[in-house]
Design a protein with these regions (language model features):
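Generic structural signal for helix capping and beta-alpha/helix-loop junctions
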Residues: 29-31, 175, 225
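Active-site-adjacent "lid/gating" segments in soluble enzymes
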Residues: 3-149, 159
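Short secondary-structure transition/capping segments
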Residues: 34-35, 178-181, 227-229
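Active-site-adjacent capping/gating segments
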Residues: 123, 130, 223-229
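Short strand->helix junction
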Residues: 1-2, 194
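Aromatic-enriched alpha-helical interface/lid elements that frame and gate functional surfaces
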Residues: 133-211, 215, 222
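Conserved beta-strand edge residues that scaffold enzyme active sites
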Residues: 26, 222-223
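Hydrophobic residues in alpha-helical segments
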Residues: 85-89, 196, 225
Length: 229
């Protein structure tokens, strides 16, 4: 449509060769979906984002319920446009920057969301997907969120719930051991879940922070905008 209006890149760059022209589309100019209408949740589905939103407490995957694909596309457009402007400063030449939403979303999602599909050799270990370990933790009066990204932090979680011996157990004491035996990862999760149910949210967060484990409350929108931080 833009070409029919006489405002396409080829037409305008003929007038101004230094032009940086940015095109944003759902699927790009080629491919079987190139003429389809599209919005954010459709891109989430096609890029695999929805399938990786796995909550063990819910038997099916779910959307990221905000504009995940739209915003990742906007960030990509900003970066690509800045790079094109720098290239023009260095070379004097303009260019056509094409950003399909499906490409931008996939690039943004891939490093962690698809890590198991990155190294596919027979001897490769894709590790534990974040979608299987990012969970809310239920306490006696609500839910909190924490994440242990190292062996030291995992031991800190065990200490925070009053069971430092769990962090010393060879089944749980290293990420290598847990990755090699995923059933132990599940077992430790069940043990910790039971321990957190005996603590309230404030107690749990204080204990985790004391153990130097990243943690915090699950705030409502209203609570978030008045949080002192």
């Amino acid at each position: 449509a833009i070409d029919r209006m006489g405002l396409g890149y080829e037409q305008l760059s003929a007038i101004n060769p230094n032009l940086i022209y940015v095109s944003i589309s759902g699927f790009g100019p080629t491919g079987p979906y190139s003429n389809r209408p599209v919005l954010d949740p459709v891109i989430q589905g096609i890029c695999g984002v929805i399938s990786r939103q796995l909550n063990p407490q819910i038997p099916f995957p779910d959307l990221v319920r905000n504009l995940y694909a739209d915003k990742s596309t906007a960030l990509t457009v900003a970066q690509a446009t800045t790079a094109a402007l720098l290239a023009r400063e260095r070379t004097g030449a303009g260019q056509h920057v094409e950003i399909p939403m499906v490409d931008a979303c996939m690039y943004f999602f891939w490093p962690d969301g698809m890590m198991d599909l990155t190294m596919v050799d027979d001897d490769a270990n894709g590790g534990i997907l974040l979608s299987s370990v990012y969970n809310l933790t239920e306490c006696s009066d609500g839910k909190i969120v924490y994440f242990a990204a190292s062996d030291k932090q995992r031991a800190g979680v065990c200490a925070a719930v009053g069971h430092p011996e769990w962090g010393e157990d060879e089944r749980f004491s290293s990420m290598a051991a847990l990755a090699a035996n995923p059933e132990n990862f599940v077992l430790l999760g069940e043990m910790l879940a039971g321990a957190f149910l005996e603590m309230n949210c404030e107690e749990a967060i204080e204990a985790l922070i004391e153990a130097d484990v990243p943690s915090g409350p699950v705030l409502t929108g209203e609570e978030a905008i008045v949080d002192p931080q």
